Amino acid sequence: MAEWIALDQLLLEARPQRSVGLCDGEVIDHAGFRQRVLAWRAAFAAAEGRDWALYFDDAVAFAAALFGAWHAGKRVFLAADNLPATLQALQPQVSGFAGDVSADYRSLVALDAALDDELQALDERACELCVFTSGSTGQPSAIGKRLDQLAREVEALQAAFGAQMEGVQVHGTVSHQHIYGLLFRVLWPLAA
């Protein structure tokens, strides 16, 4: 993997030589990813309410919306899936939805943003998300996480496994909508 970038500083400058991943079959470099984040930041900044639910099938699209929401000062709720019962249960807790959800939920869409828009470092203690347990022992329970907690997890992964990761591609079997997929499939590869 490439040079380490702390998650709170991930998008301060565009790095076109750095690959982020594939989105809809297209290779996305860091500069392109940053532009997607700016577009989502514009959308979330224009949207009322603090709490937004995200569900995306694609991990890169998800990551862009996640960082866009955080850069707009929003708290993110990760829906475990996009089934009607899940979205209906989540609806009273959030201001709206973004991503691959039924048209009934009027998903927020990314807006155009200038390529030269600036992004500030994220406040790791202010950026929040809420993940849900699987519900295997009852109803899914909400678990709040801050970016500083997620960043420490990612740093621990890098310390334990980073030396073995040079030049590898990351393939995930756990959805990025769940904590392990979020850490292993999205946040760690972005930082590394």
Predicted regions and their residues:
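Conserved pre-ATP/AMP-binding loop-to-beta segment of ANL
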Residues: A2-A6, L11-P16, A114-F132, A163-H171
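Conserved AMP-binding A3 loop
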Residues: D29-H30, Q120, E128-E155
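Conserved AMP-binding/adenylate-forming
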Residues: A42-N82, V168-H176
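Conserved AMP-binding loop of ANL adenylate-forming enzymes
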Residues: L54, F161-A192
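Flexible, low-complexity linker/hinge segments
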Residues: S102-C127, G144, E153-V154, A159
